């Protein structure tokens, strides 16, 4: 594939960037923050009347003056204070606007803001301005920069020494905007022996319509004493098909080159890519079939041109562990065109590679490439923002066994180091991290569990009366409700798991929320903040499974933590 086609394919195909976890402390803080909407069990757009009704219902149960037991009176004081704070915050338009925008932390620091803006409209305008500033910050964050260094070392087997061959350093700057499109700049410096030259690749991508984008690129290189300008369009042709066309112009006397690229999703696992190039007295075409199943890649590529004949390659890339991959590829050619006589065929090369993910942002790879004229070893170190590759070509004769030993020895050494040293240390570190996390949330979980038990004690008599009332009209009766990690079981060998099981019984709290044979839990609200609930697995995804009777018929439904729950529904009926 020529350089222009590689650039077009690079622009055309979406980049598969690895998603990294957000900052753990911020995420945990957000997960653990109290949700006023969940406490009152109201929607995000609830009216003042709905807020008052929800507050009155909870105040009837949790008001300290209604408790005859002194211990319960003391315990309910904190809950009633929290319920009152939720009602006061959401009933005040200013405080509610701040809470919706900044959360509980914003309320804690909102006194100066509320005093500054006496009118709600001005307050909302200020919040809108802050939101726009945040969007501008995101725009700045859309700028990214990465670097790559390649140090090429060569080895002469006869003289038994390495020597410096080529050094290339490049940086890539990406600027992505919704209004003005995307820009990419890739300056580079290459040094070979006593010569050095500068290169600059630039590209611009602009959306013309919803499905069509214009791209422009320029590739300048001092070594070639000129540049190549490319202009083209890429478009979504159908639900499963993308296409692009381009034209490249050269500063030299070469004629313009036209090209096209077509990508079609044949099935959920198979993709076909066709590339074509046409120039005066030259044409080239290639077809790639790519199949990916459970992160296992199988790829076949066939190239054909009027000068180079017919060639092809097969690539296989498979994971051997959660963090390691191994790949194989082999290529060959066939005759029938001017470069090869009719019927001539042969071997063009083979490669084997090993890639290992060390951390979330760092990985290494080792690969060996073999062709009829040389062996090439490549050592790669890849960071999120920087990459270093060291190709080592060997130009003189060398036995295959020696070559394989040269390639496998570092991999075997790294594997032994991993299993004997690194893995035990990482396991010990991970266990320590888990224990620290458990200890950190143990007190918090105990308080939440004790509060939920007190909630259930307070509403138990009310729930029994509700159940009797619902039975008289064949209404809604919660048979069983379980909340937490439904696919996880109690580990009786772990004291923490025994004390804080992965799931909790919330049958009574849910029955308490039933009104007139209906139950509504609003979406986008954490269910762990509902009264009578507590979070058995902080910062982990949870579900709520409810089994209930309605009209003497059994129903069952499972929803995610922030999904809406509306019962009864016919779709929940167990046939």
UniProtKB/Swiss-Prot annotation:
InterPro entries in UniProt: DnaJ-like_C11_C, DnaJ_domain, J_dom_sf, Mito_inner_membrane_organizer
Domain J: 35-103
Xref: CDD domains: DnaJ (cd06257)
Coiled coil regions, renumbered to chain: 427-456
Listed Pfam families: DnaJ, DnaJ-like_C11_C
Gene3D superfamilies, per the entry: DnaJ domain
GO cellular component, one term: mitochondrion
One of the protein's GO biological processes: cristae formation
Keyword tags: Chaperone, Coiled coil
Domain of life: Eukaryota
SMART domains attached to this UniProt entry: DnaJ (SM00271)
Family assignment from sequence similarity: Belongs to the DNAJC11 family.
Protein name: DnaJ homolog subfamily C member 11 homolog
